[in-house]
Protein backbone atom coordinates (compact mmCIF):
# COMPACT_ATOMS: atom_id res chain seq x y z
CA UNK A 1 0.00 0.00 0.00
CA UNK A 2 1.59 3.24 -1.12
CA UNK A 3 0.91 6.44 0.77
CA UNK A 4 1.63 9.91 -0.49
CA UNK A 5 2.83 11.78 2.56
CA UNK A 6 3.18 15.51 2.08
CA UNK A 7 5.96 17.60 3.56
CA UNK A 8 5.02 18.72 7.05
CA UNK A 9 2.56 15.91 7.68
CA UNK A 10 2.67 14.15 11.02
CA UNK A 11 4.68 11.11 9.96
CA UNK A 12 7.94 10.36 11.73
CA UNK A 13 9.29 8.86 8.48
CA UNK A 14 9.53 12.37 7.01
CA UNK A 15 11.68 13.62 9.88
CA UNK A 16 15.22 14.84 9.32
CA UNK A 17 16.14 13.42 12.73
CA UNK A 18 13.86 10.40 13.30
CA UNK A 19 15.76 9.04 16.32
CA UNK A 20 15.71 12.44 18.03
CA UNK A 21 12.02 12.82 17.21
CA UNK A 22 11.08 9.36 18.49
CA UNK A 23 13.06 9.84 21.72
CA UNK A 24 11.46 13.27 22.18
CA UNK A 25 7.96 11.85 21.73
CA UNK A 26 8.82 8.86 23.92
CA UNK A 27 9.87 11.09 26.82
CA UNK A 28 6.84 13.35 26.35
CA UNK A 29 4.38 10.46 26.34
CA UNK A 30 6.02 8.18 28.92
CA UNK A 31 5.53 10.45 31.94
CA UNK A 32 1.84 10.86 31.11
CA UNK A 33 1.35 7.12 30.59
CA UNK A 34 3.12 6.18 33.82
CA UNK A 35 0.99 8.69 35.72
CA UNK A 36 -2.26 7.54 34.10
CA UNK A 37 -1.70 3.80 34.41
CA UNK A 38 -0.21 4.20 37.87
CA UNK A 39 -3.15 6.23 39.10
CA UNK A 40 -5.70 3.86 37.59
CA UNK A 41 -4.15 0.44 38.21
CA UNK A 42 -1.15 0.39 40.55
CA UNK A 43 -2.20 2.96 43.17
CA UNK A 44 1.30 2.99 44.73
CA UNK A 45 1.80 6.73 45.04
CA UNK A 46 5.49 6.70 46.02
CA UNK A 47 6.59 4.46 43.15
CA UNK A 48 4.54 6.33 40.55
CA UNK A 49 5.72 9.67 41.94
CA UNK A 50 9.41 8.75 41.68
CA UNK A 51 9.15 7.17 38.22
CA UNK A 52 7.10 10.07 36.84
CA UNK A 53 9.49 12.68 38.30
CA UNK A 54 12.47 10.89 36.75
CA UNK A 55 10.72 10.74 33.37
CA UNK A 56 9.73 14.41 33.61
CA UNK A 57 13.32 15.38 34.44
CA UNK A 58 14.63 13.34 31.51
CA UNK A 59 12.02 14.94 29.24
CA UNK A 60 12.94 18.43 30.46
CA UNK A 61 16.66 17.84 29.86
CA UNK A 62 16.22 16.13 26.49
CA UNK A 63 13.81 18.76 25.19
CA UNK A 64 15.86 21.70 26.41
CA UNK A 65 19.31 20.52 25.33
CA UNK A 66 18.86 18.07 22.47
CA UNK A 67 15.43 17.97 20.80
CA UNK A 68 14.92 21.74 20.65
CA UNK A 69 18.28 22.30 19.02
CA UNK A 70 18.05 19.42 16.54
CA UNK A 71 14.36 19.59 15.60
CA UNK A 72 13.69 23.34 15.43
CA UNK A 73 17.11 24.95 15.88
CA UNK A 74 16.28 26.60 19.21
CA UNK A 75 18.02 26.48 22.57
CA UNK A 76 17.71 28.38 25.82
CA UNK A 77 19.42 28.50 29.18
CA UNK A 78 19.51 30.58 32.32
CA UNK A 79 22.58 32.60 33.30
CA UNK A 80 23.32 34.12 36.67
CA UNK A 81 25.57 37.17 36.89
CA UNK A 82 28.15 36.27 39.57
CA UNK A 83 28.67 39.89 40.58
CA UNK A 84 25.05 40.93 41.10
CA UNK A 85 23.31 37.56 41.39
CA UNK A 86 20.76 38.58 38.76
CA UNK A 87 19.34 35.79 36.66
CA UNK A 88 18.33 36.11 33.01
CA UNK A 89 17.34 33.77 30.21
CA UNK A 90 19.51 33.49 27.12
CA UNK A 91 17.97 32.40 23.83
CA UNK A 92 19.77 30.95 20.84
CA UNK A 93 18.41 30.17 17.41
CA UNK A 94 20.13 28.66 14.42
CA UNK A 95 20.87 30.76 11.36
CA UNK A 96 18.04 30.20 8.85
CA UNK A 97 20.56 30.47 6.01
CA UNK A 98 22.61 27.52 7.25
CA UNK A 99 20.00 25.27 8.92
CA UNK A 100 16.72 24.47 7.23
CA UNK A 101 14.06 23.32 9.67
CA UNK A 102 12.07 20.29 8.54
CA UNK A 103 8.32 21.12 8.63
CA UNK A 104 7.49 17.66 9.98
CA UNK A 105 9.96 18.04 12.85
CA UNK A 106 8.60 21.51 13.57
CA UNK A 107 4.97 20.38 13.63
CA UNK A 108 5.70 17.45 15.95
CA UNK A 109 7.80 19.66 18.22
CA UNK A 110 5.30 22.49 18.64
CA UNK A 111 2.28 20.19 18.88
CA UNK A 112 3.90 18.09 21.62
CA UNK A 113 5.26 21.18 23.37
CA UNK A 114 1.87 22.92 23.66
CA UNK A 115 -0.32 19.85 24.19
CA UNK A 116 1.48 18.35 27.18
CA UNK A 117 0.74 21.20 29.64
CA UNK A 118 -2.90 21.06 28.55
CA UNK A 119 -3.02 17.33 29.24
CA UNK A 120 -1.52 17.86 32.70
CA UNK A 121 -4.16 20.53 33.44
CA UNK A 122 -6.82 18.03 32.38
CA UNK A 123 -5.32 15.45 34.71
CA UNK A 124 -5.38 18.02 37.52
CA UNK A 125 -9.15 18.36 37.09
CA UNK A 126 -9.49 14.57 37.13
CA UNK A 127 -7.54 14.39 40.40
CA UNK A 128 -9.70 17.13 41.92
CA UNK A 129 -12.97 15.50 40.85
CA UNK A 130 -11.81 12.12 42.21
CA UNK A 131 -10.75 13.80 45.51
CA UNK A 132 -7.20 12.50 45.15
CA UNK A 133 -5.44 15.69 46.17
CA UNK A 134 -2.14 13.96 46.90
CA UNK A 135 -1.70 13.44 43.15
CA UNK A 136 -1.88 17.21 42.64
CA UNK A 137 1.65 17.59 44.03
CA UNK A 138 2.96 15.51 41.15
CA UNK A 139 0.85 17.44 38.66
CA UNK A 140 2.14 20.79 39.96
CA UNK A 141 5.73 19.60 39.49
CA UNK A 142 4.89 18.31 36.00
CA UNK A 143 3.22 21.59 35.09
CA UNK A 144 6.13 23.66 36.35
CA UNK A 145 8.61 21.70 34.22
CA UNK A 146 6.49 21.55 31.07
CA UNK A 147 5.29 25.16 31.26
CA UNK A 148 8.88 26.37 31.80
CA UNK A 149 10.01 24.64 28.62
CA UNK A 150 6.92 25.82 26.74
CA UNK A 151 7.40 29.47 27.72
CA UNK A 152 11.14 29.37 27.10
CA UNK A 153 10.87 27.85 23.63
CA UNK A 154 8.01 30.21 22.71
CA UNK A 155 10.14 33.21 23.70
CA UNK A 156 13.17 31.70 22.00
CA UNK A 157 11.19 31.30 18.77
CA UNK A 158 9.93 34.90 18.92
CA UNK A 159 13.40 36.29 19.62
CA UNK A 160 14.86 34.14 16.85
CA UNK A 161 12.29 35.41 14.35
CA UNK A 162 12.85 39.00 15.48
CA UNK A 163 16.62 38.76 15.18
CA UNK A 164 16.38 37.14 11.74
CA UNK A 165 13.93 39.81 10.58
CA UNK A 166 16.05 42.66 11.94
CA UNK A 167 19.22 41.16 10.50
CA UNK A 168 17.71 40.70 7.05
CA UNK A 169 16.14 44.17 7.01
CA UNK A 170 19.39 45.87 7.95
CA UNK A 171 21.51 43.56 5.80
CA UNK A 172 20.55 45.32 2.60
CA UNK A 173 21.98 48.62 3.83
CA UNK A 174 25.66 47.63 3.79
CA UNK A 175 27.61 48.75 6.86
CA UNK A 176 24.46 49.16 8.93
CA UNK A 177 23.56 45.57 8.05
CA UNK A 178 26.93 44.28 9.21
CA UNK A 179 26.68 46.19 12.48
CA UNK A 180 23.08 45.07 13.09
CA UNK A 181 23.81 41.43 12.27
CA UNK A 182 26.87 41.37 14.53
CA UNK A 183 25.04 43.07 17.41
CA UNK A 184 21.92 40.94 17.15
CA UNK A 185 23.91 37.76 16.59
CA UNK A 186 26.10 38.44 19.63
CA UNK A 187 23.05 39.26 21.76
CA UNK A 188 21.15 36.06 20.91
CA UNK A 189 23.99 33.55 20.63
CA UNK A 190 26.13 33.11 23.70
Curated annotation (Swiss-Prot):
One of its GO terms (biological process) is protein secretion. Pfam families: DUF846. Keywords: Golgi apparatus, Membrane, Transmembrane, Transmembrane helix. It is a multi-pass membrane protein. Golgi membrane protein involved in vesicular trafficking. Belongs to the TVP23 family. This is Golgi apparatus membrane protein tvp23. It comes from Botryotinia fuckeliana (strain B05.10).
